[in-house]
Regions:
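N-terminal pre-domains immediately preceding structured catalytic cores
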Residues: 2-5, 9-220
């Protein structure tokens, strides 16, 4: 009898070890990655209703999050309501109270680097007409010569849904802040045009800015 006790004890220990080996420890699931774009971003860049021409939703996956409209810290001596264009970093700022600004991503064309300084918004136009410059026609006649007489406003117009026209001392600077039907170009240098914004953004800026507003264009 005494000789069997160690064997029984050993068997019990082995059974306990086997049972422990079959026990699974519950693993906490990995948290889902945060979405690249918020619900607010999706809403802001959705299709725009109430316009005379179709403004489609922007495919956010084609954009970098930094180029979406957002409130940022912005130290400047310019008064609230001033537009500051930074062609080098491809941002446009609308100065707000409290050291902040609304920042919009922009695309910068060749004409957008041709002038810097301060001016004012002389005219605001919804769905503006567009005429290519003589330089644009010379560079790409096959693309622009047919529009030498101008193109009416519409979904295919390169100026997009809105345009702000900058004048200095009563004279046209030929500098424009406008929409685009090519939102994928935002954040990039482009061959032609001045400062282009997504149509959703230029519509937002248009609502916030009055004629006469100061605009500062930094050197590119």
């Amino acid at each position: 009898m005494a000789s069997t006790l160690p064997a029984r004890g050993l068997a019990a220990v082995m059974l306990a070890a086997l049972a422990a080996g079959c026990t699974t420890i519950a693993q906490r699931p990995e948290p889902a990655p945060a979405p690249r774009f918020s619900a607010l971003d999706v809403e802001r860049y959705g299709a725009v209703a109430g316009e005379p021409f179709h403004v489609p939703a922007v495919s956010l996956e084609d954009l970098r999050p930094r180029n979406l409209r957002q409130l940022v810290e912005y130290g400047t001596r310019e008064a609230p309501g001033t537009i500051v264009v930074d062609p080098k970093h491809r941002f446009l700022y609308l100065v707000q109270e409290g050291g902040k600004a609304l920042r919009y991503g922009v695309g910068v064309g060749r004409e957008g680097l041709a002038w810097s300084g301060s001016a004012n918004v002389a005219t605001k136009r919804a769905w503006p007409n567009w005429t290519p410059t003589p330089d644009m026609i010379r560079r790409e006649p096959g693309k622009y010569a047919k529009w030498a007489g101008g193109m009416s406003g519409g979904a295919d117009n390169p100026l997009g849904a809105r345009a702000l026209y900058l004048f200095k001392d009563g004279r046209d600077t030929l500098y424009r802040i406008h929409g685009t039907n090519e939102p994928e170009t935002i954040g990039h240098a482009v061959s032609s045009g001045c400062i282009r914004m997504m149509n959703q953004d230029v519509i937002d800026l248009y609502r916030r800015v009055s004629a006469g507003a100061k605009v500062v264009v930094l050197p590119g």
